[in-house]
């Protein structure tokens, strides 16, 4: 990416006319899943598909949120450019999954929190741009609680700290029921990002929270994400 990134604060930039406070008229229910063990990517994808199918068929059934970690892998969104893989497809260093979300190639690994949200936007707001900004705000709010300033970049999706991208967003949506969500780098090994052009952004710098807060762990951040998701989308966790 040759041009200089134009950072914007959460309240400014091209989306400054958006109300970034939760938009639900009333709360709705969701199951919360926080697996203790690392989850294979294809397993979590199956969970999401099942819940999405059920929500499409039964729109007022509980939604679902997962906060988890994955084994190391790469995922590619709809229409991803294979030129962003810096290796031969038949000689991949890690599993590669092509999935139905927006965005380019990204990398998942232990030490990164992945948030998957299967929400019925008919109960929230039927606006994908709004939804993307809300997911960004979930991460920005958590960073604020940690004493860090999360930033957006003009024309891009995700969250940066200083000049490093720490949070990625990628969603899928079918009949206004969402899939996929966000990832936040906490204390992960970032070496896998050297094998790709992350999110299709040439020369982008990738960071993790432990660059600023040494010793921080996933278990420190997960409760903050849980509450941020709950507050932003006005969710009641199902027992």
Swiss-Prot record:
Cited Pfam families: LplA-B_cat
GO biological process: protein modification process
Subcellular location: Cytoplasm
Keywords recorded for this protein, A-Z: Acyltransferase, Cytoplasm, Transferase
GO molecular-function term, one example from the UniProt record: lipoyl(octanoyl) transferase activity
Enzyme Commission code(s) on record: 2.3.1.181
Matches recorded under SUPFAM superfamilies: Class II aaRS and biotin synthetases
Binding site for substrate: 101-108, 168-170, 181-183
Pathway membership: Protein modification; protein lipoylation via endogenous pathway; protein N(6)-(lipoyl)lysine from octanoyl-[acyl-carrier-protein]: step 1/2
Domain BPL/LPL catalytic: 59-239
Site positions (Lowers pKa of active site Cys): 165
Annotated GO CC locations: cytoplasm
Known catalytic reactions: octanoyl-[ACP] + L-lysyl-[protein] = N(6)-octanoyl-L-lysyl-[protein] + holo-[ACP] + H(+)
Role noted for this protein: Catalyzes the transfer of endogenously produced octanoic acid from octanoyl-acyl-carrier-protein onto the lipoyl domains of lipoate-dependent enzymes. Lipoyl-ACP can also act as a substrate although octanoyl-ACP is likely to be the physiological substrate.
Family note: Belongs to the LipB family.
Anything else known: In the reaction, the free carboxyl group of octanoic acid is attached via an amide linkage to the epsilon-amino group of a specific lysine residue of lipoyl domains of lipoate-dependent enzymes.
Protein name: Octanoyltransferase
Native species: Prochlorococcus marinus (strain NATL2A)
Lineage, opening ranks: Bacteria, Bacillati, Cyanobacteriota, Cyanophyceae, Synechococcales
